[in-house]
Design a protein with these regions (language model features):
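Hydrophobic transmembrane alpha-helices of multi-pass small-molecule transporters
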Residues: 1-11, 16-18, 157, 161-166, ...
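Helix-loop-helix hairpins and the membrane-proximal interhelical loops
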Residues: 1-55, 190-293, 398, 506-508
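N-terminal alpha-helical transmembrane segments of multi-pass membrane transport
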Residues: 1-59, 103-108, 114, 118-127, ...
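Single conserved hydrophobic/aromatic residue that forms the stacking wall/gate
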Residues: 511-520
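Membrane-interface alpha-helices at helix entry/exit sites of multi-pass transporters
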Residues: 55, 98-113, 286-294, 428
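Membrane-embedded alpha-helical modules
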Residues: 108-225, 335-486
């Protein structure tokens, strides 16, 4: 309790609030730009955080992460174009409401639900941290190795349209992550006699290349702007009343968001659809869904923001990224000298609580700014793509050059940009590649430590047996599900009968077929 209160007092230091506010503003901007999101936003600020105090760096990084899933509602509601993957389900009813002249009502309900979901996620994270020590102590090198293997399996299997593509993307990330000096022997690997590759490819370059470059290319191909017209004047109080009226729906979907967010690599890709499906399953009259039902906005938005708190649970406790943007967050930890795991709940507990407080305040700031300045922010969606794209290119190249001030970084950026464009066009999983890249060194070190300390005896330990069973069950169930979906239709992305493991409990949802977002 003492450290919790100390972190609260530190939160309101002017410098900390300034960095948090700056990060929140950047997060709001990248959330509005379709396809950018928290991963690209973090990649932009990462080159600058290594010169900051740890608390200030954490404030800026959390500030970038938290509000992206709030401001992405603007393009989703106003034009039917999801700002990030997490706002796809919001389009289903948000855009029809906008066409009926109720854009303000939809935005107000979305921002309010996002705020409550974000605070709920921060609360769940704080409770999880309190009980984390015995969980961490139960995981030795062998259990950690199997946990990382399970995470890689789930990331590869759940983040793409095809099981093989997802696993292959993850495996390719592991190979790329092994470029450079071997952590055990010190031997150079896949360097092709170039000094640049001895230390491996910088994480920021990989993140920007895979995620930012493909979206900018998409903007260059597009015509016009994100939105064509605005109608955000009337209906703000109606949206607030809608959220209060549906408070139990917010609570249920926020809980779902936390649970799904804790699954490595999964959160942002389907959490909004899980919440939307839950809403349809628990509602008697579903005739208005897809035509402008306000509950179709509240459910995915509350889950989408709550998942950020859930995704931080494996990130902080085990150093396993809960989503693609958490890879960049862990990279920031390395730059400022923070080690995920036991230290986060012991020696660095004050920083952990500071992150939790910052997450809650960033959600409040983000929702407040979006609601208070909605008319002005909405105009940002009217900026033509041909103006946005060059500005974003300049920002990305500046962030890339600031890492090592090495021209080879630009070559690597373009190379990973080509990989990102190829993956995007052919349905391969970019988050799986990024997470595999980040976990490559961790897998290698844990496998060596496990073999050196336990040999094969760790396989007979209780936690190891449970993890092995989960690995095998994940492979079987997801292979079966993907086969069934491919058999039913080659052209339709079906999310029927997916099974996700939350802890040791499966959460299943059915009777939901994903439509083509842009045809709403």
């Amino acid at each position: 309790m003492e450290q919790l209160l100390a972190a609260l007092f530190q939160l309101f230091e002017p410098t900390h609030l300034a960095f948090l506010f700056a990060g929140t503003l950047l997060g709001l901007i990248v959330g509005i730009l379709p396809g950018m999101g928290g991963t690209s936003g973090l990649a932009l600020v990462l080159p600058f955080v290594f010169t900051m105090e740890p608390s200030h760096a954490l404030a800026m990084m959390i500030g970038v992460l938290a509000p992206t899933t709030t401001s992405d509602t603007f393009p989703a509601v106003l034009m039917g174009v999801p700002g990030t993957a997490g706002s796809q389900a919001t389009v289903m009813d948000g855009f029809p409401l906008s066409k009926k002249g109720m854009a303000a009502r939809a935005l107000s309900a979305a921002f309010s639900a996002s705020l409550l979901g974000g605070i709920f996620g921060a609360f769940i994270l704080s409770v999880s941290i309190y009980y984390a020590i015995p969980i961490i102590m139960a995981f030795g090198f062998g259990e950690q190795f199997l946990l990382v293997v399970l995470a890689l399996l789930m990331v590869g299997a759940l983040t793409g349209d095809n099981l093989f593509k997802g696993i292959a993307s993850c495996f390719l990330g592991l190979i790329i992550g092994s470029i450079g000096t071997a952590p055990i022997t010190g031997d150079p690997r896949y360097t092709f006699n170039t000094l640049y590759l001895l230390e491996g490819v910088p994480l920021v370059v990989v993140g920007l290349g895979l995620f930012a470059i493909p979206e900018i290319v998409g903007l260059l191909d597009a015509k016009g702007s994100i939105a064509k017209s605005l109608n955000t004047k009337k209906g703000w109080f109606t949206g607030l009343k809608d959220v209060v009226k549906n408070w139990f729906l917010v609570l249920r979907c926020s809980t779902l968001g936390c649970l799904v967010g804790a699954l490595p690599g999964l959160g942002g890709t389907v959490v909004d659809w899980i919440a939307y499906s839950h809403l349809k399953q628990t509602t008697k009259d579903t005739s208005q869904f897809g035509k402008g039902d306000i509950r179709g906005v509240i459910a995915p938005e509350s889950a989408n923001n709550a998942k950020e708190g859930g995704a931080l649970i494996p990130t902080l406790i085990f150093g396993i990224p809960g989503s693609g943007n958490k890879v960049l967050l862990l990279g920031g930890f390395v730059l400022i000298g923070i080690e995920p795991g036991l230290d986060m709940v012991t020696t660095n507990l004050d920083l952990t609580y500071l992150m939790i407080w910052s997450l809650a305040i960033a959600n409040i700031l983000g929702a407040g700014i979006c609601m208070g300045f909605s008319s002005q922010i909405s105009k940002f969606t009217l900026v033509p793509y041909y103006i946005l794209a060059p500005v974003m290119v300049c920002l990305i190249f500046f962030a890339t050059f600031n890492i090592n001030r090495d021209w080879y970084d630009f070559i690597a950026l373009l190379a990973f940009g080509l990989i990102g464009i190829t993956f995007k066009n052919f349905g391969w999983s970019r988050p799986a590649l990024l997470i595999g890249f980040f976990l490559s060194t961790k897998v290698e070190l844990l496998s060596y430590q496990t073999h050196a300390v336990y040999g094969l005896s760790f396989l007979s330990r209780p936690v190891s047996i449970i993890l092995i069973v989960l690995c095998l069950a994940t492979i079987y169930l997801l292979s079966k599900q993907r086969f069934d979906n491919n058999y039913k239709s080659d052209n339709q992305k079906s999310k029927m009968s997916q099974i996700y493991y939350v802890g040791f409990l499966p959460v299943s949802y059915t009777h939901l077929t994903l439509p083509t977002i842009y045809s709403v």
